[in-house]
Amino acid sequence: DYYFSLDEGSKLYPSDTTYVHDYAVIDGQRAFIYFRELEEKLPGYEYNAQIKHIENILTKDIYSMPAEKADSIGDDNINATDLWITGEYLNIKYQFYHSNNEDKKHMLNLVINEASTGENDKPDYVNLEFRHNAYNDSQLTLGTGLASFKLDNIAEQLKEKKGLNIRVKSLYDGERFMTIDIKKENN
Protein backbone atom coordinates (compact mmCIF):
# COMPACT_ATOMS: atom_id res chain seq x y z
CA ASP A 1 0.00 0.00 0.00
CA TYR A 2 1.03 3.58 -0.59
CA TYR A 3 -0.36 7.08 -0.20
CA PHE A 4 0.44 10.55 -1.50
CA SER A 5 1.80 13.38 0.67
CA LEU A 6 0.37 16.64 -0.61
CA ASP A 7 2.35 19.87 -0.62
CA GLU A 8 0.34 21.44 2.19
CA GLY A 9 1.05 18.44 4.43
CA SER A 10 -2.12 16.37 4.14
CA LYS A 11 -2.27 12.71 3.06
CA LEU A 12 -4.29 11.28 0.17
CA TYR A 13 -5.13 7.58 0.08
CA PRO A 14 -5.65 6.11 -3.43
CA SER A 15 -8.60 3.76 -2.79
CA ASP A 16 -9.45 3.42 -6.48
CA THR A 17 -6.52 3.18 -8.91
CA THR A 18 -8.43 1.64 -11.82
CA TYR A 19 -7.33 4.40 -14.22
CA VAL A 20 -3.68 4.24 -13.16
CA HIS A 21 -3.24 0.54 -12.30
CA ASP A 22 0.10 0.37 -14.13
CA TYR A 23 1.61 3.46 -12.48
CA ALA A 24 5.01 2.63 -10.94
CA VAL A 25 5.20 4.24 -7.50
CA ILE A 26 8.64 5.64 -6.66
CA ASP A 27 9.29 7.02 -3.17
CA GLY A 28 10.14 10.74 -3.37
CA GLN A 29 8.81 11.16 -6.92
CA ARG A 30 6.83 14.40 -7.23
CA ALA A 31 3.73 14.32 -9.38
CA PHE A 32 0.51 16.06 -10.28
CA ILE A 33 -2.34 13.87 -9.02
CA TYR A 34 -5.72 14.26 -10.69
CA PHE A 35 -8.36 12.72 -8.46
CA ARG A 36 -11.99 12.59 -7.42
CA GLU A 37 -12.58 12.65 -3.69
CA LEU A 38 -14.64 9.74 -2.40
CA GLU A 39 -17.27 10.18 0.30
CA GLU A 40 -15.99 7.41 2.58
CA LYS A 41 -13.51 8.79 5.14
CA LEU A 42 -10.44 6.79 6.13
CA PRO A 43 -8.71 7.23 9.50
CA GLY A 44 -5.27 8.84 9.17
CA TYR A 45 -5.97 10.42 5.77
CA GLU A 46 -7.44 13.78 4.88
CA TYR A 47 -8.47 12.52 1.45
CA ASN A 48 -9.77 9.20 0.16
CA ALA A 49 -9.74 9.30 -3.62
CA GLN A 50 -10.27 7.75 -7.00
CA ILE A 51 -7.09 8.51 -8.94
CA LYS A 52 -7.84 9.69 -12.48
CA HIS A 53 -4.34 10.48 -13.75
CA ILE A 54 -0.78 10.86 -12.46
CA GLU A 55 1.74 13.05 -14.23
CA ASN A 56 5.31 12.81 -12.94
CA ILE A 57 7.29 15.99 -12.35
CA LEU A 58 11.01 15.96 -13.16
CA THR A 59 12.52 15.41 -9.70
CA LYS A 60 16.27 15.66 -9.22
CA ASP A 61 19.03 16.24 -6.70
CA ILE A 62 21.16 19.39 -6.71
CA TYR A 63 24.46 18.51 -8.38
CA SER A 64 27.92 19.72 -7.38
CA MET A 65 29.48 20.57 -10.75
CA PRO A 66 33.27 20.40 -11.09
CA ALA A 67 34.82 22.55 -13.85
CA GLU A 68 35.49 19.52 -16.09
CA LYS A 69 31.76 18.66 -16.20
CA ALA A 70 30.55 22.13 -17.27
CA ASP A 71 30.36 21.17 -20.97
CA SER A 72 28.25 18.06 -20.40
CA ILE A 73 25.90 19.90 -18.03
CA GLY A 74 25.45 22.64 -20.64
CA ASP A 75 24.54 26.30 -20.31
CA ASP A 76 21.92 26.82 -23.01
CA ASN A 77 19.27 29.49 -22.67
CA ILE A 78 16.25 28.83 -20.46
CA ASN A 79 13.77 30.98 -18.56
CA ALA A 80 12.83 30.39 -14.96
CA THR A 81 9.34 31.90 -14.88
CA ASP A 82 8.48 31.01 -11.30
CA LEU A 83 10.33 29.69 -8.24
CA TRP A 84 8.85 28.43 -5.00
CA ILE A 85 9.76 26.12 -2.17
CA THR A 86 7.41 23.37 -1.05
CA GLY A 87 8.57 21.25 1.85
CA GLU A 88 11.98 19.88 0.94
CA TYR A 89 11.88 20.90 -2.74
CA LEU A 90 12.65 23.93 -4.86
CA ASN A 91 10.19 24.04 -7.75
CA ILE A 92 11.11 25.84 -10.97
CA LYS A 93 8.61 26.55 -13.71
CA TYR A 94 10.64 26.98 -16.89
CA GLN A 95 10.54 27.73 -20.63
CA PHE A 96 12.93 26.78 -23.42
CA TYR A 97 12.85 26.45 -27.18
CA HIS A 98 12.92 23.02 -28.79
CA SER A 99 12.18 21.23 -32.09
CA ASN A 100 9.19 19.23 -30.81
CA ASN A 101 11.07 16.06 -31.77
CA GLU A 102 10.55 13.42 -29.06
CA ASP A 103 13.95 11.88 -29.89
CA LYS A 104 15.70 15.13 -28.93
CA LYS A 105 15.99 15.10 -25.15
CA HIS A 106 17.09 18.10 -23.14
CA MET A 107 18.77 17.98 -19.74
CA LEU A 108 18.04 20.28 -16.80
CA ASN A 109 20.11 20.58 -13.64
CA LEU A 110 20.41 22.79 -10.60
CA VAL A 111 24.09 22.96 -9.75
CA ILE A 112 26.62 24.26 -7.31
CA ASN A 113 29.27 25.52 -9.73
CA GLU A 114 32.60 24.61 -8.15
CA ALA A 115 34.41 26.72 -10.78
CA SER A 116 32.38 29.89 -10.11
CA THR A 117 34.42 33.06 -9.69
CA GLY A 118 31.98 34.20 -7.02
CA GLU A 119 31.67 37.54 -8.82
CA ASN A 120 27.85 37.55 -8.70
CA ASP A 121 27.42 35.53 -5.52
CA LYS A 122 25.36 36.87 -2.66
CA PRO A 123 27.14 36.00 0.59
CA ASP A 124 23.93 35.59 2.61
CA TYR A 125 22.50 33.09 0.11
CA VAL A 126 23.33 29.63 -1.22
CA ASN A 127 24.44 30.33 -4.79
CA LEU A 128 23.23 27.92 -7.47
CA GLU A 129 22.89 27.77 -11.26
CA PHE A 130 19.90 26.49 -13.22
CA ARG A 131 21.51 24.77 -16.22
CA HIS A 132 20.03 23.54 -19.52
CA ASN A 133 21.64 21.35 -22.16
CA ALA A 134 19.63 21.42 -25.43
CA TYR A 135 22.07 19.02 -27.13
CA ASN A 136 21.99 21.22 -30.27
CA ASP A 137 18.22 20.81 -30.68
CA SER A 138 16.60 23.30 -33.08
CA GLN A 139 14.89 26.24 -31.38
CA LEU A 140 11.48 26.18 -33.08
CA THR A 141 8.79 25.94 -30.39
CA LEU A 142 8.59 27.50 -26.94
CA GLY A 143 7.81 24.84 -24.36
CA THR A 144 7.14 25.00 -20.65
CA GLY A 145 7.59 22.59 -17.81
CA LEU A 146 8.15 22.12 -14.12
CA ALA A 147 11.11 20.65 -12.28
CA SER A 148 11.55 19.95 -8.56
CA PHE A 149 14.96 19.84 -6.95
CA LYS A 150 15.56 18.18 -3.57
CA LEU A 151 17.07 20.58 -1.04
CA ASP A 152 18.34 17.88 1.33
CA ASN A 153 21.97 17.95 0.19
CA ILE A 154 22.25 21.72 0.84
CA ALA A 155 20.11 21.70 4.01
CA GLU A 156 23.10 22.37 6.30
CA GLN A 157 24.22 25.35 4.19
CA LEU A 158 20.67 26.73 4.15
CA LYS A 159 20.51 26.86 7.95
CA GLU A 160 22.99 29.74 7.94
CA LYS A 161 21.61 31.56 4.88
CA LYS A 162 18.63 33.74 3.98
CA GLY A 163 17.73 31.65 0.94
CA LEU A 164 18.82 30.84 -2.60
CA ASN A 165 20.44 32.98 -5.30
CA ILE A 166 19.99 31.25 -8.66
CA ARG A 167 21.82 32.13 -11.86
CA VAL A 168 19.81 31.57 -15.05
CA LYS A 169 21.00 32.14 -18.64
CA SER A 170 17.64 33.45 -19.83
CA LEU A 171 16.14 33.32 -23.31
CA TYR A 172 15.96 37.06 -23.85
CA ASP A 173 17.91 38.89 -21.13
CA GLY A 174 21.14 36.91 -20.90
CA GLU A 175 22.44 36.11 -17.44
CA ARG A 176 19.92 36.81 -14.64
CA PHE A 177 19.96 36.17 -10.92
CA MET A 178 16.81 35.23 -9.05
CA THR A 179 16.60 35.06 -5.27
CA ILE A 180 14.14 33.21 -3.13
CA ASP A 181 14.05 33.75 0.62
CA ILE A 182 13.41 30.84 2.92
CA LYS A 183 11.02 31.30 5.79
CA LYS A 184 12.71 30.24 9.00
CA GLU A 185 10.79 28.63 11.85
CA ASN A 186 11.16 30.60 15.08
CA ASN A 187 11.99 28.19 17.88
Question: What are the residue ranges of the model-derived segments?
Answer:
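First exposed extracellular module after export/assembly in secreted or surface-exposed proteins
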Residues: 1-187
